[in-house]
Amino acid sequence: LQTINKSLITITAFSMLLASTASNSAPRIIPKAPTVIASSHILIDFDSGKVITEFNQKEHLAPASLTKIMTSYAVFSELKQGHIQLSDEVTISKKAWQTGGSKMFIEVGKKISVEKLLKGMIISSGNDASVALAEHIGGAEETFAELMNQYAEILGMHNSNFQNATGMPASNHYSSAEDMAILAQALIRDFPEFYKIYSEREFIFGKELKSGKPIKQSNRNKLLWRDDSVDGLKTGYTKAAGYCLVASAKKDGMRLISAVFGADSVEARARESQKLLNFGFRFYETEPVTEPGKTLS
């Protein structure tokens, strides 16, 4: 019996060695990147800047509220340089108040802190908050847009031009999936202390006129509820842009950034973004999984 047991142990050990050797020598199987149903998309590795997969990534497209990622980058830069403070009180102009589209619901003449306006812009996607911040920094939204373009040039966003701080439709206002990935990478890298705002799921500000109840607005990034690894960034929609989403997720020490332009619906932009992130986390390690990738710069 002792001899049989020794033989079994020897056979088992040899079998395990063979299995291990076979596993180590097996070719790495990497499938083709998934088809993304959108006008343009890109997926990059945050640390290296390598492109994992992309489609029409340089195409000039309407960015809608993805514009606010650049607006926030400029505001964060002003904060970091000490030109403004989170506690600064901003007097709301008529122009900011009457700006159309999604709103934080601020009122003319009221004083609102930079911190609250940032949250209203990022979480609630408030166009009114975006204009108020732009005016606080640049004096006029048009001047602030010039500042946005200067930052875009510094970051190497060669396929972007901003005419306003909101992303409302305007001639010659455009960006690209690649540029938005570059911007998201820079924002997370340069302003980790402020980036966390993008992970907040809701923002409460103001009161309903009839009931007096606080107005609670939810972050439009559905992935914040669906995937614990996702911690930002921003959605966007206009008729011209379609449904857009720039997202970032971190898992097992690796961070990925995806950008999707021109999806068909709120659900589609979340689904297609999730598709990209899942693919990247499953098959990307230290090298691009498709053709030899390039570094975003």
What are these regions (language model features)?
Residues 157-161, 169-174, 178-297:
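Domain-terminus/edge residues, biased toward the C-terminal soluble/receptor-binding domains
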Residues 6-7, 69, 251:
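Hydrophobic alpha-helical segments, especially transmembrane helices
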Residues 17-18, 80, 276, 284:
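Hydrophobic alpha-helical membrane context
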Residues 24-195:
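Active-site-adjacent loops and short helices of periplasmic peptidoglycan-processing enzymes
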Residues 10-19:
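Bacterial N-terminal signal peptides
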Residues 1-11:
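Bacterial N-terminal signal peptides that target proteins for export
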